[in-house]
From Swiss-Prot:
Residues 436-558 form the HD domain. Residues 673-757, 785-852 form the ACT domain. The lineage of its organism: Bacteria, Pseudomonadati, Pseudomonadota, Betaproteobacteria, Neisseriales. This is Bifunctional uridylyltransferase/uridylyl-removing enzyme. Its cofactor is Mg(2+).
């Protein structure tokens, strides 16, 4: 590199470093952009003189560089423009120029061509056209740059451009779905992100409007308050993106788990642990994108209406205060929301009641939103407002859209201060993927869908139950309040009771309705906990559950709320296995509350008789049946449900000395049930678990049982890896059975491979502290319940089983609850040694070492 260019490069590096240092000290986005852009332009000036002195070409900054918004590791968008088609020599010259840019580590993105060629290239390319919309002359022939800008603007169909940018935004938002996009959002492309701000400004610029906020204010596109909010939201997002680039040292626009704590710390969130720093950063981020979405709801239709060829304007009278304009509702006088604040809810009530109205007219929305910022205690105390707010839930129609609209514009938080505390609040527990407010509204949506015929195909039984449930509005309210006390420290289910009862008292609920609402909030985790962590075949478990529930109404409401809550936590959590667990508990509890099935001896006897009837119909002699029952022992009927007993009996009755493996695909499920019967021996359970893990199966439940003649009868429910289609299941089943058969006959040893304990990025950087509790079982000496919470990973259950074996603890039952990347496992174990506190402490310590 020539000496003069080396000097220019060194100057650039000093200016770039100075811009970064100045930014980290002063924290001013606009100053950083100005200084860093100037540094790049200084280097480009030297390179241009070296390659194109006295040339007819011109160099233009386009895209982000063109608008002067250059982030530390962003591409430098450029266009080399010629008044005439490029000769081979000029093209080679441009190629050398671009290579020099790469040598200088500028990450260039360069378009080149004549004015005509470049205009033609963007004619059907909305991205290219957008880049040139922000073109800015740098060096060379200014006349060529002016000609390009003039022709680009002349050929642009503004209405088509606006429509294309809005469609592009819709597609971008649609892609930003799923747990990855929520937990590690792309600050540039997510809904409400920087690209949405750019889109608004592009639409304005294409119409010939100035795109700096003061000018948009003068042109009455923005109000003063809106300009301030948009500027604040933009600066927040730009701050985060600058720090993200500086910490990642690359053009990374995703707030990855491993970068969140670094970005938070560099932005000054000090005095907090890494998790709290990350949560605070993400809360700031979510509030910023919420502001952008709020303003987009007003500005997008307003800007679009300036150029779009709208259908014939149809205006209908609604009442003295409102008219309908096409599918929007408009206030006759927009100051009505300030003069008569009760109309803040009234217009929403009208919109909820009428399916032909889908939105507020932009100027009405602007006035309404401005008035909502005046919501205070006196607004809440107005009985008319409280009646209307409760009416949103009683009506039910469009409830999800209504609540999301009120949340987007901050009304829920102003009306209910408890709600404001959970807006944008993230939970780093490895299974929730939404901020608390979004999660709650998703749960409300799920409950509401159960009430609608059009969605009955999703969950037919639950939908039928919901549609016959009399107090649907209380269920909606329970969904709304179930997590409202998150983030306060302590038990949110208990703390939420007071919020629910206060709301009920203020919003004219009856005592009976208030009691049901408060009970559901307090117990919203009860059913999922019992179904996923406890042995619901154990009559004592069912008895304790039903003593908490007490009535069929509570049982139905809790079942519907639990389904909706799990489905609204993380799409990965809901599966056929969880559905069957909840449904089994629901039906068992229903029988118990009706007076059927509560006596343990009656229950065990019925299970045994059902199996005996099956074997008798299969012509199995009674003598042979008794031999089987004696081998299994009476405890067997306490630990297994009827369907398992029938399956085991049919496979074992003719020969209960020969080891066997059997499996079956569970109906309407992506899971296998597997039984393994073989002589007892050391570490068998752990080694079986390793086989399942090696095949990529998630173990959903496991029941370890030892017969009277010292055989193991272990039963597993395992989930098939998600990449397999149902038509692959028989082949997968055959391969699994083949390896298990080889194992039980002593031909293979199932051991772990060295590379299989890898965990996700989320689990590495947002881990949960493992916890272990060991509790003696009442009325059963030497039996214990072991509860474990830890980061989920391959071979976890096998490793824990190894620890139990090493401490002479016999594992008899395992209930596995895998919540995405979090494992909450329950074990029933037998060990006289655990009476010794030292041995119990040693077991805990070894388990913790294995889990950490």
């Amino acid at each position: 590199m020539p000496a003069n260019l080396s000097s220019a490069l060194e100057t650039f590096k000093r200016q770039r470093d100075a811009a970064e240092a100045h930014y980290l000290k002063a924290n001013r986005v606009s100053v950083f952009f100005r200084e860093y852009t100037a540094a790049v332009e200084t280097l480009l000036a030297a390179l241009w003189v070296e390659h194109f002195q006295n040339s007819a070409l011109c160099l233009m900054a386009v895209g982000g560089f063109g608008r002067g918004e250059l982030y530390p590791c962003s591409d430098v968008d450029l266009a080399v423009v010629s008044p005439a088609p490029l000769s081979d020599g000029i093209q080679e010259q441009i190629a050398r120029f671009v290579q020099t840019l790469w040598d200088c580590k500028l990450m260039p993105s360069v378009k080149s061509g004549s004015v005509g060629e470049l205009c033609e290239s963007v004619r059907d390319d909305i991205t290219g056209d957008t880049a040139f919309l922000e073109a800015r002359f740098l060096f060379g022939n200014r006349q060529t740059a002016d000609e390009l800008a003039k022709k680009m603007n002349a050929q642009r169909n503004v209405a088509a451009f606006v429509e294309a940018k809005l469609v592009e935004m819709e597609h971008r938002h649609a892609k930003s779905q799923g747990s990855g996009a929520v937990l590690e959002p792309n600050i540039k492309s997510c809904p409400g992100g920087l690209r949405d701000i750019h889109t608004l400004l592009w639409i304005a610029k294409a119409q010939g409007l100035a795109t700096d906020l003061p000018d948009l204010l003068k042109q009455r596109i923005l109000t003063r308050a809106e300009a301030g909010m948009l500027s604040h939201g933009y600066r927040r997002l730009a701050h985060i993106r600058i720090h993200l680039h500086l910490n990642a040292k690359r053009a990374e626009d995703r707030l990855l788990f491993d970068l969140q704590p670094q970005v938070a710390e560099s932005m000054g969130y000090e005095g907090l642990n890494l998790r709290r720093q990350s949560e605070e950063l993400m809360r700031v981020f979510y509030r910023a994108i919420k502001t952008v979405k709020q303003l987009g709801g007003i500005l997008t239709p307003m800007l679009q209406s300036r150029v779009s060829s709208t259908p014939l304007r149809v205006t209908l009278r609604i009442d003295d205060d409102y008219i309908q304009v096409n599918n929007q509702i408009a206030a006759r006088h927009t100051d009505i929301f300030f003069r008569r604040p009760e109309h803040i809810f009234k217009i929403v009530e009208i919109m909820q009641q009428r399916n032909d109205i889908t939105a507020l007219e932009p100027q009405t929305l602007r006035a309404w939103w401005g008035a909502t910022r005046k919501i205070n205690r006196s607004f809440y105390q107005n009985s008319e407002n409280r009646h209307r707010f409760a009416g949103f839930f009683r009506n039910g129609n469009g409830l999800t859209q209504t609540l999301r609209f009120l949340n987007l514009y901050g009304v829920l938080g102003r009306y209910l201060p408890a709600w404001e505390k959970i807006v944008g609040l993230l939970q780093h527990d490895l299974f929730h993927i939404y901020p608390v407010d979004d999660h709650i509204l998703t749960v409300v949506r799920n409950v509401r869908r159960l009430a609608l015929d059009m969605h009955s195909h999703e969950l037919p039984y639950a939908s039928a139950l919901m549609q016959s449930f009399e107090k649907q509005d209380i269920l909606y309210l329970a969904a709304f309040f179930h997590d409202i006390a998150k983030g306060r420290g302590g038990d949110h289910a208990i703390q939420g009771i007071a919020d629910a009862r206060q709301f009920a008292a203020d919003h004219f609920l009856t005592e009976e309705e208030s009691d049901l609402l408060a009970w559901l909030v307090e117990n919203h985790l009860l059913m999922s906990t019992v179904a996923q962590k406890e042995d619901i075949q154990d009559p004592s478990v069912l008895d304790a559950f039903c003593k908490r529930v007490q009535t069929h109404e509570r049982l139905s409401a809790l079942y519907l709320l639990t389904i909706s809550d799990i489905r609204g936590t993380n799409p990965k959590l809901w599966n056929a296995w969880r559905a069957s667990l909840l449904e089994s508990l629901f039906h068992a509890a229903g029988r118990y509350l009706t007076g059927n099935g509560g006596n343990p001896h009656t229950l065990f006897g019925r299970r045994r008789q059902e199996a005996a009837d099956l074997l008798t119909r299969a012509a199995v002699p009674e003598k042979q049946q008794k031999k089987l029952w004696n081998a299994l022992g009476s405890a067997y009927f306490a630990r297994h449900q009827s369907r398992e007993i029938l399956w085991h009996a049919a496979n074992l009755v003719h020969d209960f000395e020969t080891p066997i493996v059997r499996s079956r695909i569970l109906p309407q499920s992506d899971s296998f049930q597997v039984m393994v019967f073989m002589p007892n021996g050391p570490r068998l359970f752990a080694r079986l678990c390793r086989i399942f893990s090696r095949h990529g199966f998630d173990i959903l439940a496991a029941r370890a049982f030892i017969t009277e003649h010292d055989y193991i009868l272990d039963t597993f429910i395992v989930q098939i890896p998600s990449q397999h289609a149902p038509e692959d299941y028989p082949d997968i089943q055959s391969a699994l059975e083949a390896e298990l058969n080889s194992f039980i006959h002593g031909h293979t040893v199932a051991e772990i491979s060295s590379h299989s304990r890898r965990i996700s990025r989320r689990s590495r950087y947002m881990p949960i502290a493992p916890s272990i509790t060991i509790t003696p079982e009442e009325d059963y000496p030497d039996w214990y319940s072991v509860e474990i919470t830890a980061v989920n990973r391959p071979f976890l259950l096998a490793d824990m089983a190894e620890v139990f074996f090493a401490h002479n603890v016999s594992l008899r039952y395992a209930k596995i609850s895998t919540l995405d990347e979090r494992a909450e496992d329950s074990f029933t174990v037998f060990s006289p040694d655990l009476n010794n506190p030292k041995i119990q402490s040693s077991l805990k310590q070894t388990l913790l070492e294995q889990l950490s």
